């Protein structure tokens, strides 16, 4: 509830077109890599290879829990992930995208852990 209120209040300051839930990536995306056709790997951001992960920017992603928006922003299809949007940051332990069976298992573990600690 507090997150919804925070987003709603941010939207109503008049400064923002959207407010929505986000969380940070567990690991730095700047140290990420992909498998290449030859079977090896290649960094997406090789310029950060020698940087410590704690020295890299914190990257956020959409938590998909709620979206507030001004009517004109929705009607004009204004892009959401831009400077005119307010991020309501939610801790990672409250966010789980479910696309795979692995994701579902992780969501169940998070839920069980939360129930045990409450």
Regions found by a protein language model. Give the residues of each.
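Conserved alpha/beta core of the MobA/IspD/sugar-nucleotide pyrophosphorylase nucleotidyltransferase superfamily
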Residues: 58-118
């Amino acid at each position: 509830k507090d997150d919804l209120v925070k987003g709603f209040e941010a939207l109503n300051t008049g400064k923002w077109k959207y407010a929505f839930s986000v969380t940070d990536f567990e690991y730095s995306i700047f140290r990420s890599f992909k498998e290449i056709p030859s079977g090896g790997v290649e960094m997406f951001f090789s310029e950060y290879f020698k940087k410590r992960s704690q020295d890299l920017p914190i990257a956020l992603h959409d938590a998909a829990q709620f979206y507030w928006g001004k009517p004109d922003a929705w009607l004009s299809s204004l892009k959401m992930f831009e400077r005119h949007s307010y991020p309501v940051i939610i801790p990672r332990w409250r966010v789980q995208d479910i696309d795979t069976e692995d994701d579902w298992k992780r969501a169940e573990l998070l839920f069980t852990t939360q129930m045990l600690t409450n």
